[in-house]
Amino acid sequence: MKKAVVLGLILVAVYAAGAWALWPFNKTTENIQPSVKGNRHSQSFYAVKAEMLDKVYYDHRKTLYCNADFTAHKKIIKPDGFKIPNLRQIDFKVYDISPEDLQRKAERMEWEHIVPAQNFGKTFTEWSKGHKNCVSGKGKAFKGRSCAEQESEDFRYMYTDMYNLYPSIGAVNYLRANFSFTQFDARQKNTFGRCSMKISRNKAEPPNQVKGMIARTYLYMQKTYPRYSIGEPAYSVLKAWNKKYPVSKWECARAFRIEKVQGNANMLVKKPCLERGWYQDNWR
């Protein structure tokens, strides 16, 4: 009897100490824990863009929204049917750009923050109010992105998080601006010809094939950086997209490569990729 009691106490103690984690559960999901660690790899946006090109997108040079090819020198090869819109056709937004400059932007690839920098930047006082060191050579105080990037290490790490960066046609990136994503009525027309990216009334809807990737990027940023919150109604839309549009082999390889470089995982991507056996460098 005493031996049984002692043995029972030992088992309880072992369980409480966490030895249960050694039990051989399903190998595709064992030891997977939500990641709360964010980017601590680089604070240089310039350096990170080069790494994205050379270490992540080296064999998948396609833009996110319109699936356009781009070269190692970031020159866009426009897909068939891609068109630059008449800016007057996009409701409620006045763009400070000439048609000629917009056309030039359509010819180059840019790295887009899927969660716009302004959305999380405004949570930093350096962005919203400035800093005593944010003074120009002419003695004029400034705030916003320039001040946050100059004075806040935490902002720089969020700004250069590789999971939040995707290649985009420059004109699409410019017109999407800092708009949140939504689900338009089915009657809403494409903004860029055959590319099914839609922008209207200061909102945007991406093509179906990338809605899952976008949702998992937003949800990762909110989970990893608690100062950022998505808010409604966007949060409900993104949660629905995450459920409806599962990971692809490319999304899995992209996350695998970023983890190798940046050091932390996006578990919203990694877990389903592991379950499918797709969390690896090869995506073809």
Each predicted region: which residue ranges?
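Domain-level detector of nuclease and nuclease-like folds
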Residues: 100-284
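Nuclease and nuclease-like effector domains acting on nucleic acids or nucleotide cofactors
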Residues: 1-107, 125-134, 185-201, 278-284
